[in-house]
Amino acid sequence: MDELAGGGGGGPAMASPPRQQQGPGGNMSLSPGGNGAAGGGGPPATEGAGPAAGPELSRPQQYTIPGILHYIQHEWARFEMERAHWEVERAELQARIAFLQGERKGQENLKKDLVRRIKMLEYALKQERAKYHKLKYGTELNQGDLKMPTFESEETKDTEAPTAPQNSQLTWKQGRQLLRQYLQEVGYTDTILDVRSQRVRSLLGLSNSEPNGSVETKNLEQILNGGESPKQKGQEIKRTSGDVLETFNFLENADDSDEEEENDMIEGIPEGKDKHRINKHKIGNEGLAADLTDDPDTEEALKEFDFLVTAEDGEGAGEARSSGDGTEWDKDDLSPTTEVWDVDQGLISKLKEQYKKERKGKKGVKRVNRTKLYDTIADLGDDELPLIPSGIINQSRSASTRMTDHEGARAEEAEPITFPSGGGKSFIMGSDDVLLSVLGLGDLADLTVTNDADYSYDLPANKDAFRKTWNPKYTLRSHFDGVRALAFHPVEPVLVTASEDHTLKLWNLQKTVPAKKSASLDVEPIYTFRAHIGPVLSLAISSNGEQCFSGGTDATIQWWNMPSPNVDPYDTYEPNVLAGTLIAHTDAVWGLAYSGIKNQLLSCSADGTVRLWNPQEKLPCICTYNGDKEHGIPTSVDFIGCDPAHMVTSFNTGSTVIYDLETSQSLVMLSSQMDSGLQSSNHINRVVSHPTLPVTITAHEDRHIKFFDNKTGKMIHSMVAHLDAVTSLAVDPNGIYLMSGSHDCSIRLWNLDSKTCVQEITAHRKKLDESIYDVAFHPSKAYIASAGADALAKVFV
């Protein structure tokens, strides 16, 4: 047996006297872990001194070198193990810390990268805006000191903001500092202040014929036009300081904390007879304003000085310009801003005196026709200019009588059609009031500018900025032949289609299945209506959505009860769905229209008659029109939206007639000067009535869409709308937009006010040289739909 260090001492002790051997041997067996040590020398010791070992056990414990060494080794091993555990835990925590630090750094880098991208995009946008402005107006758009954005660290930005004194002016000083920092980030320097003061002088100095104004004129053109020739003076007059600041609109949507503080500083707004009184420190124009307030043009020009007045107007805050209706910020305790702007008051006073004299001499100056300007810009599709509050548009529309000059016939009206806001929150682009409610502009909605040319240039930008683009969302595929007609449920996202495959189908747009190879969704029909024995050509849904009417080549009108939108497609047959059949026509029924006011139905047929029905009565056919075919064969029919006691019918001869439903007499024949010629070119495919105005719109085989006044019967406007025959029309429930479908495979959306195309959608493929048969707006939801000869119906959102 191997002996440890303690056992080595037992060997020589055997030859020694027994008394000496006993102590170490006995003690070693009692020491901690010493049993193994006594193993080598224990037995000889107990043999020689066994009887004397008993009393030694009660003695105090004594430590030996072998026992101590063994204990130290044991403790050292335990310490090493705990230390290894601690090292592992520390490594794990350090790895966690490093991961979190890396994540934080990555987020910071991402933030910096996004900030850089934003700045670069702002820079690129300004470059594009300048390029576009030069192409359109032929002048350089002054954007201050346009240069590449510089990216400085957050620390330096923080040190730039000085600690403002804690006084009453702390709020607006912080706002000014914030704006100054914004200006530096986007490349504007203090020269913007000089440009703005020069702009004021340009309002007065460019029209100045005296020599002392010529120097200012040249300097201004050097600043604004980059050395352009004086030929652009007229255009420079039209552009005001708002143009210089138009690139600052990216600040309008910023969620600044200063906004609430600034709102607290706004005082009461003067109204009514006080509109011409200016309640704050002017720069030298107190007396002059009082002298000239009787002239509105003078008042307009003098209001251009308002952005020089208080520090709250900020260096470059376009939305803080004083509004033309007297909405101004009154803070008399603010310090004068002469040192801020560095304006030569003497020169300003002198120029104003000259302006006052000139105004007395030119009272009858002809102003630019605002509507012509608006129409021209609308035709150009001005997308790039910044948007302006809708209040400006309302003000501009009401401020002048708008003569439109699309055609000579249209100029007979002093006030052309203005398209108001209807109910239903205008899911389409909507009128200005609806836009304001949707966008929630709040106080910003009251801000206006007072220069005619300024918002004439920006007007179409507002329309385009709020423009909604329709995109295909659902494809309805279950028909086996061309889809001739479709109609939406008045409330639910439900659609009914009528097809040449002899059936009608009910679709719930909320029950969709993913399409195989496209981003759109396929919808399965939830019900199929079967009663016609030929192609179904026309369709109408009652105003409460409970009944549906369909007409076909079998000369019948089928009357249906609408199933529930949640009906099971595989449920048992329900005979109550078919409510009845209206029989009176002798040929195909090509058009249907329903009026919810008296629950009446109109139908037009290839037999030459137009019939009025009340399906609830025992003798449902109330009246028959055009029984002698005096106007030709009717092709389409509709109730007059603003006068339900009248209806309008189009004929294949090109004539359109308004009838009185009570007397059955024709009231007005709608005709245009060009309605003489071939019958095929005059053929009208569809007639619709505007929902709120006395206007009738017709779609023609010769690619035209024509607008008629119901009162005079004269054509208001005519336009070539498509590349092929126009087959279908629909007006949105608010009466702002018109949708047309054509055999050229396209759907076009038109602004009824400007008669311009807002959007074109290629929706269907041709089949036998025919494409789109019908289009429809949902009465209350953001859906439009089209029906095509390719057996598809498509829904857009």
From Swiss-Prot:
Transmembrane spans: none
GO biological process, one term: negative regulation of hippo signaling
Main localization (coarse): cytoplasm
Annotated spans, Calmodulin-binding: 166-183
Caveolin-binding: annotated segments: 71-79
Residue stretches of biased makeup (Low complexity): 44-55
Compartments, record wording: Cytoplasm; Membrane
Keywords for this protein: Acetylation, Calmodulin-binding, Coiled coil, Cytoplasm, Membrane, Phosphoprotein, Repeat, WD repeat
GO molecular function terms listed in the Swiss-Prot or TrEMBL record: armadillo repeat domain binding; calmodulin binding; protein phosphatase 2A binding; protein-containing complex binding; protein-macromolecule adaptor activity; small GTPase binding
Positions of region (Disordered): 1-60, 313-336
Residues recorded as bearing Phosphothreonine in the entry: T150
Membrane topology term: Peripheral membrane protein
WD repeat start-end pairs: 478-517, 531-570, 584-623, 679-718, 721-760, 767-796
Domain of life of the native organism: Eukaryota
Gly residues bias locations: 1-12, 33-43
Phosphoserine PTM sites in chain numbering: S202, S214, S229, S257, S335
Coiled coil: 77-136
A GO cellular component annotation in the UniProt record: postsynapse
Keyword Isomerase tagged: no
Post-translational modification N-acetylmethionine, affected residues: M1
UniProt key word Repeat: yes
Family affiliation: Belongs to the WD repeat striatin family.
Function: Calmodulin-binding scaffolding protein which is the center of the striatin-interacting phosphatase and kinase (STRIPAK) complexes. STRIPAK complexes have critical roles in protein (de)phosphorylation and are regulators of multiple signaling pathways including Hippo, MAPK, nuclear receptor and cytoskeleton remodeling. Different types of STRIPAK complexes are involved in a variety of biological processes such as cell growth, differentiation, apoptosis, metabolism and immune regulation.
Protein's UniProt name: Striatin-3
